[in-house]
């Protein structure tokens, strides 16, 4: 009943006396106050609803990730009873192990022996086991690669004049970074990942693959100098030949499933084990005798089993590496922690996205908020143990998913074997590699073979990179182009402008990592994401849908979309 009708009713039930007038006045005042309170409550409720729509509940992203993934935890292990798991373990083990050792050598040389093989092996093993068993998305391979090695030795070069403990400083960098990881995860800031498109991912993928090729070349240049410091042309030339021949044969057999030779099963088998067989064969080749006896191939560096590498910068009898540093240095570590968080925010999440591309036809839910929080905890553990902090790997993460794909005879993807066993077991294998017998075996692998593996991984990654594919399309004979390609619908002008943006972004990333300013290259990654927002004003909508699309299907990023998490509640019993 409205206030006006109530007032009329009261006035009719009273005489013209003063008492009736006073009663009427009091009633009207009470109704006015009630109306005012009701309107105030309504305004507050509306404001609460508006706030709730704008800002999701703290931690709701992590809750939704866990809510989606926990029902699949049992099947993540049961589904591992599939043949695709075996070649995936072998391939992922070598793809993760050998490049990590090469980057360990970089850090060993440029941090005065602070980080070595054992630190990198322990970091990769911990990451594989933790994310294999506890991770939300076990397809994403986590370990040590180029960006974090660049970060670690750049920090060392910057703080060396401060005369402070490197491991104490890295401990506080990891502590600050862990705090920022958890803050970003619990405030649902990982939702910003929904705006990451293929443009920055392709740039970063191109950058990583070129860095792998660069690393292979750097390894070969070191083969021309003997341990005594003298030049050794025959050793260097022999190493170059082994690396290039291994690359040629490795790529030939890696791509064997595209050839018409033999049956589909045989082609798949050869392609599956090409990486492992290449490493084993060409490592054995250097022992074939003859003129090879006159060549001294440099081998991979190894150290004492399960002991820290450095005999100067940290105690040898424990993996607890923390050393006290002045309070001012604790706060000097703060901006470095921010840079590390930015690097991992982009590097890890993009690795996870690329491991869940729409063409892989995944069926199980993703996990971004929870995994980023878990990454913060592994970063903390790394600081305590004095090992490089691990994060998502490119190209290892998407390569891992590709090894699990089930294809038909025409190489079309049918499904993917989504499980936890491969990530977990390759982590255990890397941990086992820290034992003395396996370290000795590892020490028999020539550095030339490692260089060849870098070339294989880098070139194989370039062949599937969209930027390279568009360059090839642009310079192809118009009469030989695939008329069914979506790029046929893009004008040459738009193609050139878009490629200019892509190559500029790549050049910026690659250039800054080769300077003292390498610590700031995560900002270049962030800038490439921001640049993509301007494309809507530069390219026609239909062409932009072809040039810059979403990395993963909407099902994969559903917990990153604000419209899906704004009104979500903890322990909500109602399912959509």
UniProtKB/Swiss-Prot annotation:
Feature: compositional bias, Basic and acidic residues: 26-48
Region of interest (Disordered), residue spans: 19-48
Compartments where located: Cell membrane; Vacuole membrane
Keywords, sorted A to Z: Anion exchange, Cell membrane, Ion transport, Membrane, Transmembrane, Transmembrane helix, Transport, Vacuole
Pfam family, one: HCO3_cotransp
Similarity comment text for this entry: Belongs to the anion exchanger (TC 2.A.31) family.
Protein name from the UniProt record: Boron transporter 1
Annotated organism of origin: Saccharomyces cerevisiae (strain ATCC 204508 / S288c)
């Amino acid at each position: 009943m409205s206030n006006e009708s109530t007032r009329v009713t009261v006035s009719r039930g009273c005489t013209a006396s003063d008492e009736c007038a006073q009663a009427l006045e009091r009633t009207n005042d009470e109704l006015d106050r009630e109306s005012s309170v009701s309107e105030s409550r309504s305004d507050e409720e509306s404001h609460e609803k508006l706030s709730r729509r704008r800002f999701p509940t703290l931690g709701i992203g992590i809750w939704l990730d866990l809510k989606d993934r926990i029902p699949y935890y049992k099947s993540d292990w049961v589904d591992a009873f599939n043949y695709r798991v075996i070649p995936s373990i072998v391939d992922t083990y070598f793809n993760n192990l050998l490049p990590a050792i090469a980057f360990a050598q970089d850090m060993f040389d440029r941090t005065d022996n602070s980080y070595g093989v054992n630190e990198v092996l322990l970091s990769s093993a911990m990451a594989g086991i933790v994310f294999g068993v506890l991770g939300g998305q076990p397809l994403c391979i986590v370990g040590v690669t180029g960006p974090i090695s660049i970060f670690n030795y750049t920090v060392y070069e910057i703080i060396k004049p401060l005369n402070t403990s490197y491991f104490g400083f890295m401990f506080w960098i990891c502590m600050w970074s862990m705090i920022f990881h958890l803050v970003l995860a619990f405030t649902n800031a990982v939702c910003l990942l929904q705006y990451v498109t293929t443009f920055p991912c392709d740039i970063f993928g191109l950058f990583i693959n070129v860095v792998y090729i660069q690393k292979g070349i750097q390894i070969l240049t070191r083969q021309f100098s003997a341990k005594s410091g003298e030049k050794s042309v025959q050793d260097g030339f022999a190493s170059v030949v082994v690396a290039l021949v291994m690359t040629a044969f490795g790529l030939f057999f890696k791509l064997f499933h595209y050839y018409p030779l033999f049956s589909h099963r045989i082609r798949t088998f050869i392609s599956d084990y090409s990486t492992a067989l290449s490493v084993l064969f060409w490592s054995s080749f250097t022992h074939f005798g003859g003129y090879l006896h006159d060549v001294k191939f440099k081998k991979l560096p190894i150290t004492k089993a399960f002991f820290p590498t450095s005999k100067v910068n940290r105690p040898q009898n424990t993996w607890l590496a923390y050393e006290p540093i002045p309070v001012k240095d604790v706060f000097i570590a703060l901006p470095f922690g921010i840079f590390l968080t930015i690097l991992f925010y982009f590097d890890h999440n993009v690795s996870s996205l690329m491991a869940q591309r729409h063409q892989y036809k995944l069926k199980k839910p993703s996990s971004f908020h929870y995994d980023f929080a878990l990454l913060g905890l592994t970063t903390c553990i790394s600081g305590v143990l004095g090992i490089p902090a691990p994060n998502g790997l490119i190209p290892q993460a998407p390569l891992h998913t590709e090894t699990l794909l089930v294809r038909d005879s025409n190489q079309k993807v049918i499904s993917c074997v989504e499980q936890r066993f491969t990530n977990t077991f390759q982590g255990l294998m890397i941990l086992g590699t820290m034992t003395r017998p396996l370290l000795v075996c590892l020490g028999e692998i020539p550095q030339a073979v490692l260089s060849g593996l870098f070339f294989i991984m880098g070139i194989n990654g370039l062949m599937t990179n969209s930027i390279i594919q568009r360059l090839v399309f642009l310079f192809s004979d118009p009469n030989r182009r695939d008329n069914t390609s979506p790029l046929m619908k893009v004008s040459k002008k738009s193609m050139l402008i878009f490629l200019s943006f892509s190559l500029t972004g790549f050049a910026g990333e690659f250039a800054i990592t080769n300077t003292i300013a390498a610590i700031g290259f995560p900002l270049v990654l962030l800038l490439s994401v921001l640049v993509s927002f301007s494309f809507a004003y530069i390219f026609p909508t239909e062409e932009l849908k072809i040039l810059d699309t979403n990395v993963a299907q909407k099902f994969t990023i559903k917990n990153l979309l604000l419209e899906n998490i704004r009104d979500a509640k903890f322990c909500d019993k109602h399912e959509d």
